[in-house]
Regions:
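Short, Lys/Arg- and Gly-enriched loop/turn segments at beta-strand edges
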Residues: 61-70, 87-89
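Residue-level recognition of conserved beta-strand edge/terminus positions
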Residues: 54, 60-61, 80
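ATP/adenylate-binding site constellation spanning eukaryotic-like Ser/Thr protein kinases
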Residues: 71-74, 118
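Acidic, low-complexity mobile loops and tails
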Residues: 1-56, 93-130
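Short, conserved catalytic or interaction motifs in soluble domains
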Residues: 62, 82, 106
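Short, charged/polar surface micro-motifs in flexible loops or helix N-caps
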Residues: 33-34, 74-77, 82-84
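Short, conserved beta-turn/loop elements at beta-strand boundaries and strand-helix junctions
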Residues: 19-22, 80-86
Length: 130
């Protein structure tokens, strides 16, 4: 299983968020990608959409399934990764870098702080295999 970068926080729905100044970059984890298989489509929200922590914000389709994407924190969508429209496989190739999905302006920094750190996420994944 892939390592989980410790410069970001994680959710139990397998999304990650990385702080970039006063913004957060969001994507899905390597574990999620592993479960999905080859990604064929990523459906993301419009710019300036307001998201609520834990709420559905888009969908990701793969050869195996269609899965919902959930916001790790509340905030406003400032940017989406338009590269994923043309090349959804970027999510498979690089879930933590080129496969990012959203850039958010978070409503509250405390929501980010409440997410799982890399070691807590790794422990959560270990609990899934038992």
């Amino acid at each position: 299983m892939a390592d989980h970068p410790d410069d970001r926080r994680y959710t139990k729905d397998h999304e990650w968020a990385r702080r970039e100044g006063d913004k957060l970059r969001v994507g899905i984890t390597a574990y999620a990608v592993e479960q999905l298989g080859d990604v064929t489509l990523v459906d993301l929200p419009q710019l300036h959409t307001k998201l609520r922590a834990g709420a559905h914000f888009g969908d990701i389709e793969s050869v195996k399934a269609v899965s919902e994407l959930f916001a790790p924190v509340s905030g406003e969508v400032l940017e989406t990764n338009s590269e994923l429209e043309r090349n959804p496989e970027r999510v498979n190739e690089s879930p933590y870098e080129q496969g990012w999905m959203l850039l958010l302006k978070p409503d509250s920094p405390s929501e980010f702080d409440a997410l799982l750190d890399a070691s807590a996420y790794a422990e959560f994944l270990a609990s899934l295999s038992h």
